[in-house]
């Protein structure tokens, strides 16, 4: 049918069954036109006709909601605002590719396969990895990568992406099919979005990848629907037995395209390594001119049977490799050096730069790490410098170019007083890190401490974000953790951009956090160098806050994961009268800390009572899953290897922990032997 034929039908006089058939036909027609426009870039009707037909479908469904088609173009406009995302397990683990950083390493990968092979070559999109599940050809749900074992269900947001098929374009779909791809925002759309964000929300995204990832994790799919996200498919994950798998990777990509998915138009089939080199050379030179950001290239063995023969490691397939482009370096000028204050008072110098594009991002700030680095690199205000940025790494100043130095270039000196609160800055034990001594009296430290206090692994007050903390501190509404629990509705609604619903959500989130575990509370109060694992060890050892407060240095250093520096920091924390006052005030307002419950563990000869460290990645276990399993049989799982460690459980790609275990003579257990011991 044509648009005019749809318009000519007198749908208002149709019988119910005929009207439903008309609505279904119109929805299918619009889905096909959307596919032609967004995926193939070959529209056959005008934008005006599409908009009119879309509006007609909306009106018909609004008047006849019982006839709303499942997985139609109407789902692309977004729906209700969600309270949060459900976490679900992947049917097939979402692994990662191993990386190489030079043509020599790429050649090694090619030679190790020991076969005369073809490689399917494609750009490595710099976006958000996603899995989309289809049942009998219809969109079922979508999940982010997460930790590879489980991810967040973001179906409503992914449905709004115009080139994501809501129905597979095939008359014989498999019962189940999981399609994997990368959600991106092209360069021009990113610039347009940032212009809008700057004008309407006074903030911008750092790069297209962050914009895509941030958009998919929004709770309001109607906002996501307005953002021009795009999906590029690169393969499949889980599939049912009735799926006929093609013989080659290249044919698989063609099949996905026939199903309605967008694939890269820069794919290439290399018949030998010379053609791989040619592809690498071509894409390296074309990278800057592509419509979207790429951070490398992906090479996959083309023959599917050969892929199965070559196999997998726990981390990912051995038949594919990711070539990562080298870090991009450009010249800029140091306009000024400012000093930032962190949660523990650490003073970090930051270079304010003449804005320059590095790795697809406009960079105007770069870390200088510490004053010793500044002196070592001889960086001065006014210098021309080399700035480097790779992936999501914070931009850094690599070196100065003294040959271009002006006579008025100024040396950088560490201030003697805090730039925020004017307290003394001290350098303890002649270390590289200088610290503000203001503590809770320093607004910068207060703000960062409160951000840490409400964070997910601490008190988990998820609706109280970093920007809102800054607003509350600036408005003198909070200064100490207990102040958070004294906030009221009127105070919150009086802040900029805080409507009634948002304010109530914050208050509900605060109330929900009033019964933290002892481990969470210890982590939340922010004792220097005490992280999540150490907090857990302290909570399990002492059993209550009262016992922890009375801890002696000698007892602390006997605990796994607690060294002398950490023990000193704990003792110093409880010797500070302000810290004690803050904790007591916190308890006085009715916070109920949940002490750990002593659990009788199942006895296991190999692990009960043993101190265990886990390192590397595992084929049959997630890290969290393995940790919980070991704890359930009485093992103490710690994060670092020491003389107190009884054994190290080692997966693929183990690093320094394995080396240290071997140096100390600690028993090493490989995954192959682990199952028998468990």
UniProtKB/Swiss-Prot annotation:
Alphabetically ordered keywords of this record: DNA damage, DNA repair, DNA replication, Ligase, Magnesium, Manganese, Metal-binding, NAD, Zinc
Active site, renumbered: 124
Enzyme class per UniProt: ligase
Cellular-component GO terms for this entry: cytosol
Domain BRCT: from-to ranges: 602-678
Positions bound to NAD(+): 47-51, 96-97, 122, 145, 182, 300, 324
Pfam families: BRCT (PF00533), DNA_ligase_aden (PF01653), DNA_ligase_OB (PF03120), DNA_ligase_ZBD (PF03119), HHH_2 (PF12826), Nlig-Ia (PF22745)
Names of required cofactors: Mg(2+); Mn(2+)
Binding residues for Zn(2+): 418, 421, 436, 442
E.C. no: 6.5.1.2
One Gene Ontology term of the molecular function aspect: DNA binding
GO biological process, one term: DNA replication
Catalytic activity: NAD(+) + (deoxyribonucleotide)n-3'-hydroxyl + 5'-phospho-(deoxyribonucleotide)m = (deoxyribonucleotide)n+m + AMP + beta-nicotinamide D-nucleotide
Family, similarity comment: Belongs to the NAD-dependent DNA ligase family. LigA subfamily.
Functional summary from the UniProt entry: DNA ligase that catalyzes the formation of phosphodiester linkages between 5'-phosphoryl and 3'-hydroxyl groups in double-stranded DNA using NAD as a coenzyme and as the energy source for the reaction. It is essential for DNA replication and repair of damaged DNA.
Name of the protein: DNA ligase
Source organism (scientific name): Francisella tularensis subsp. tularensis (strain SCHU S4 / Schu 4)
């Amino acid at each position: 049918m044509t648009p005019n034929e749809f318009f000519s039908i007198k749908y208002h006089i149709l019988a119910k069954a005929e009207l439903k058939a008309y609505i279904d036909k119109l929805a299918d027609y619009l889905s096909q036109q959307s596919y032609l426009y967004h995926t193939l870039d070959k529209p056959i009707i005008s934008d005006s006709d599409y908009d009119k037909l879309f509006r007609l479908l909306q009106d018909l469904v609004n008047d006849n909601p019982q006839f709303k088609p499942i997985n139609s173009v109407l789902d692309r406009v977004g729906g209700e605002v969600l309270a949060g995302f459900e976490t679900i397990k992947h049917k097939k683990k979402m692994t990662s590719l191993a990386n190489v950083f030079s043509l020599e390493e790429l050649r090694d990968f090619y030679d190790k396969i020991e076969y005369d092979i073809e490689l399917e070559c494609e750009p490595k999109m710099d976006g958000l990895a996603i899995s989309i599940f289809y049942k009998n050809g219809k969109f079922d749900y979508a999940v982010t990568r997460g930790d590879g074992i489980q991810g967040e269900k973001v179906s409503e947001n992914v449905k709004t992406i115009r080139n994501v098929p809501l129905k597979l374009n095939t008359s014989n779909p498999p019962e189940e099919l999981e399609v994997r791809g990368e959600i991106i925002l092209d360069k021009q759309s990113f610039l347009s979005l940032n212009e809008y964000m700057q004008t309407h929300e006074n903030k911008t995204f750092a790069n297209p990848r962050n914009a895509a990832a941030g958009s998919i994790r929004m709770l309001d799919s109607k906002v996501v629907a307005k953002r021009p996200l795009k999906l590029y498919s690169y393969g499949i994950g889980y599939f049912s037995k009735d799926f006929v798998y093609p013989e080659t990777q290249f044919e698989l990509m063609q099949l996905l395209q026939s199903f309605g998915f967008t694939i890269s138009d820069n794919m290439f089939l290399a018949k030998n390594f010379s053609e791989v080199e040619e592809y690498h050379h071509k894409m390296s030179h074309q990278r800057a001119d592509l419509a979207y950001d790429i951070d490398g290239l992906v090479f996959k063995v083309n023959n599917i049977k050969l892929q199965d023969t070559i196999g997998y490691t726990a981390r990912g397939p051995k038949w594919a490799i990711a070539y990562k482009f080298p870090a991009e370096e450009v010249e800029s000028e140091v306009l000024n050096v400012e000093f930032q204050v962190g949660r523990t008072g650490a003073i970090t110098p930051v270079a304010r730069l003449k804005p320059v594009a590095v790795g697809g991002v406009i960079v105007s700030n770069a870390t200088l790490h510490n004053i010793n680095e500044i002196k070592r690199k001889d960086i001065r205000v006014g210098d021309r410098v080399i700035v480097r940025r790779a992936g999501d790494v914070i931009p850094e100043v690599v070196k100065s170019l003294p040959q271009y130095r002006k006579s008025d270039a100024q040396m950088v000196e560490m201030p003697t007083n805090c730039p925020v609160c004017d307290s003394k800055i001290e350098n303890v034990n002649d270390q590289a890190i200088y610290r503000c001594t203001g503590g809770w009296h320093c607004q910068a430290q207060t703000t960062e401490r409160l951000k840490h206090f409400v964070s997910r692994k601490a008190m988990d007050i998820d609706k109280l974000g970093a920007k809102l903390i800054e607003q509350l501190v600036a408005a003198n509404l909070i200064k100490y953790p207990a102040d958070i629990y004294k906030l009221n509705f009127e105070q919150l609604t009086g802040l900029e951009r805080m409507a009634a619903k948002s304010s109530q959500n914050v208050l509900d989130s605060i109330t929900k956090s009033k019964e933290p575990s002892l481990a969470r509370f210890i982590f939340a109060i922010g004792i220097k160098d005490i992280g999540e694992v150490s907090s857990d060890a302290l909570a399990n050892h002492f059993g209550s806050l009262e016992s922890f407060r009375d801890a002696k240095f000698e007892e602390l250093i006997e605990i796994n994961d607690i060294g002398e520096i950490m023990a000193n920091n704990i003792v110093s924390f409880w010797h500070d009268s302000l810290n004690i006052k803050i904790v007591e005030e916190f308890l006085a307002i009715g916070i109920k800390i949940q002490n750990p419950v002593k659990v009788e563990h199942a006895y296991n000869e190999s692990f009960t009572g043993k101190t265990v460290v886990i390192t590397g990645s595992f084929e049959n276990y997630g890290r969290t899953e393995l940790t919980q399993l070991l704890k359930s049989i009485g093992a103490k799982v710690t994060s670092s290897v020491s003389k107190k460690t009884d054994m190290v459980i080692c997966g693929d790609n183990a690093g320094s922990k394995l080396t240290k275990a071997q140096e100390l003579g600690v028993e090493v257990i490989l995954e192959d032997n682990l199952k028998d011991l468990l």
